[in-house]
């Protein structure tokens, strides 16, 4: 009887073992599925990290392949809007910074934005004082290595800008621009400022220049920081004359590099639009303008204890362009 009873309980025990095995299989399958899902999580995180890396790297790539336009303006809203519209179509332009020198007056930011959208962001920077050197601040919005600085009455063709930017990429430590000037030492040892109408400064054929004006030029954004570190007397001179910040920048660059401060690029189509505005006339119309420029050169020589500017006769022009069509009116 005892054996019979023992034998009768065997089927139940077998069923229990089967249930246990089934449960173990289910648990094992669940563990495998959970493990597989867990293994997928690092891939998701890795994808996110790759995306994040791309986002982090993209500004550096943009910094090399694009430039920021800085334009200082005063009493020329009509021209400003026209120029902003023109420069929106320039390739490689990353951002536009408008240095608004009409102190206490509201800029045309709302009007500009209301007529958008625009392909290139424009940032208006109202100033608390109308100073010439406002445009040489270290703007936190500048995210590119190259800065294009353009006066608010100057229209430069997209073709000229694309070409000049390509030259700057080859010579990123110099000013690459469209308007050359030079200094000349007189017999008395006093320096004069001028253009190609002055005597040739050295032996040999052809003419030379020693400065490239920054109002139509590309230069490295690091020079904005270096400008802030120049002697206080330099800043005071610019504020005193409301002039000569471009001459000071040429002194800075050539002192920093030991090379000529800039390279002259011959423009194909660059136009001064000052006659088309109802606003402010440029400083170069003032009778004392060139006298001030000569004054600044001599003052800077005293501040820096010497003349650092170097002459150059290099002019770069676009190969193969039909020069009969040149329209430069500068």
UniProtKB/Swiss-Prot annotation:
EC number from the UniProt entry: 2.4.1.223
Segments on the Lumenal side according to the record's topology features: 43-330
Residues annotated to bind Mn(2+): 153
Superkingdom as given in the UniProt entry: Eukaryota
Topology, Cytoplasmic side: 1-21
Binding residues annotated for UDP-N-acetyl-alpha-D-galactosamine, in chain numbering: 72, 76, 101, 130, 135, 151-153, 245, 293
Pfam families tied to this protein: Glyco_transf_64
SUPFAM superfamilies, per the entry: Nucleotide-diphospho-sugar transferases
Cellular compartments per GO CC: cytosol; endoplasmic reticulum membrane; nucleoplasm
Residues carrying a glycan: 75
Membrane topology: Single-pass type II membrane protein
Record-annotated disulphide pairs: 244-296
Cofactor(s) in the UniProt record: Mn(2+)
Gene3D superfamilies: Spore Coat Polysaccharide Biosynthesis Protein SpsA, Chain A
Subcellular location: Endoplasmic reticulum membrane
Keyword vocabulary terms for this entry: Disulfide bond, Endoplasmic reticulum, Glycoprotein, Glycosyltransferase, Manganese, Membrane, Metal-binding, Signal-anchor, Transferase, Transmembrane, Transmembrane helix
Major place of residence: endoplasmic reticulum
Binding locations of UDP-N-acetyl-alpha-D-glucosamine: 72, 76, 101, 130, 135, 151-153, 245-246, 293
Any one GO molecular function term: glycosaminoglycan binding
Effect of residue 293 to A: Reduced activity
Membership in a protein family: Belongs to the glycosyltransferase 47 family.
PANTHER family: EXOSTOSIN-LIKE 2, SYNTHASE CPS1, PUTATIVE (AFU_ORTHOLOGUE AFUA_7G02500)-RELATED
Protein name in the entry: Exostosin-like 2
Species the sequence originates in: Mus musculus
Organismal lineage: Eukaryota, Metazoa, Chordata, Craniata, Vertebrata
């Amino acid at each position: 009887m005892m054996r019979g009873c023992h034998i009768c309980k065997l089927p139940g025990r077998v069923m229990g073992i089967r249930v246990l095995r089934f449960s173990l299989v289910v648990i094992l399958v669940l563990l495998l599925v959970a493990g597989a899902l867990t293994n997928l999580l690092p891939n998701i995180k890795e994808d996110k990290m790759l995306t994040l890396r791309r986002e982090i790297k993209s500004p550096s790539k943009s910094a090399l392949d694009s430039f920021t336009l800085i334009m200082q303006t005063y009493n020329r809203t009509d021209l400003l809007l026209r120029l902003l519209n023109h420069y929106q179509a320039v390739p490689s332009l990353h951002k536009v910074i408008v240095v608004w020198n009409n102190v206490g007056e509201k800029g045309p930011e709302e009007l500009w934005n209301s007529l958008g959208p625009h392909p290139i962001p424009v940032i208006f920077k109202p100033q608390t004082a109308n100073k010439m050197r406002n445009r040489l601040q270290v703007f936190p919005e500048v995210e590119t290595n190259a800065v294009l600085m353009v006066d608010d009455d100057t229209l430069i063709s997209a073709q000229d800008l694309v070409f000049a930017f390509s030259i700057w990429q080859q010579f990123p430590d110099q000013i690459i621009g469209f308007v050359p000037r030079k200094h000349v030492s007189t017999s008395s040892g006093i320096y004069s400022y001028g253009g190609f109408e002055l005597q040739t400064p050295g032996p040999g054929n052809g003419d030379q220049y020693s400065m490239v004006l920054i109002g139509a030029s590309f230069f490295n954004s690091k020079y904005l920081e270096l400008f802030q570190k120049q002697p206080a007397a330099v800043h005071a001179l610019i504020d005193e004359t409301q002039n000569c910040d471009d001459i000071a920048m040429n002194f800075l660059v050539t002192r920093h590099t030991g090379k000529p401060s800039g390279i002259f690029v011959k423009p194909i189509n660059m136009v001064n639009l000052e006659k088309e505005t109802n606003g402010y006339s440029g400083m170069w119309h003032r009778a004392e303008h060139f006298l001030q420029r000569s004054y600044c050169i001599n003052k800077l020589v005293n501040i820096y204890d010497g003349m650092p500017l170097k002459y150059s006769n290099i002019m770069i022009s676009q190969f193969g362009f039909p020069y009969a069509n040149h329209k430069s009116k500068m």
